[in-house]
Amino acid sequence: MNRRVAVYILVALTVLMLVDGKYGLFDTTAPYRHLVRIEEAKGAGLDPGTPSAEKSGLLEEMLGPGQVLRLNNALGHINVTGTPGAERAQLNYNIYVYAANEAVGEAYLDRLDIRVVQSETGLDVRLVEPAKRPEEVHQVRLDVSASIPSEARVEIYNNMGTVRVENVSGPSIINNAFGDTTIKEVGGKLNVDAAYTNLDVTRVRGDLVVKGSYGSSSLRNIDGNVTVESDFRTTSLTDVKGDIEAEISFGGIAANEIDGDIKTKGAYTIIGARNVTGSAIAHTEYGTVRFQGIGKDMIVDARRSDVTIILEQVPDHRISLETENGSLALQGTLSQLQPQTGEAGKKMVNAVVGAGTHSIEVRNVQGNVSVKHPPHP
């Protein structure tokens, strides 16, 4: 085994173990748990020590319904809360300078300022620094705690730090890295890019788009459609009213209580979907797929993966299963369906159970397929 292949396998096992342990979907990685230890990101790089100089202030500006508070920040913590009926934005800020000594810090602090530009679209807030930072100044941090009208929107671009946003309108945009990101109660569409973070989103009354690699995402109570793009990340979705479309690699996705359809594409991933009213589609390689309680059609196109489908309703399906160089098992009330053996190690089942209202289509190469319908008393 060459070194590159060994690295890929180790990374895949690491991510599968994290997903399996976090969501309890499967027990596929139990023999490997002693090999790797995983710790989630907790705001790396945000503790440079005691600041050499600091100052604080308060800014107040008019901000109307539908207007946007736009924050651009390199390093710091952002907290924005919407207040019903408010007409102004209030921003409490703290600037910290980390320097070689207090004198250098104080001198540089005097050259810093908060710039607020008001326009028809809203407010643009950012820290203004000299073009060149002295070598004796190590870091500058800006923390902002803001209260805005709940009918206003936000656009936050934060390179490093924790971000917390609650009770604002949409469409809103939140980009953050290297710090936990918590978002609650967004009255409209939300677009999030949160790399190297642990992301928690609750209650979005619109569509949700989530991008970002490394860390974890918890997405709950979403009224619209959800789009997920990530690498090396675990994502859980609960109570989604619309459709889900996810493209992931070296990670996993667990979806539960979904009113629409779910479509996933991934590699080196664990894909799990349970209690889905619509259809479920998965395209994957080097991973695991588990569908349970899917209301409509199920389609799986897999390579070197294990596929498990559990029917909770009375079977009423057109069933087409095929695996090459793997096992094919039908259990419970479906055990009377016997796989046929073909060329090149293929095993196949083609049958209609009930009226065939819905379909189950699975194609797998060098992987196992299991379809079961537990008998009910």
Label for each model-derived stretch:
Residues 1-194, 198-377:
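Intrinsically disordered, low-complexity terminal regions
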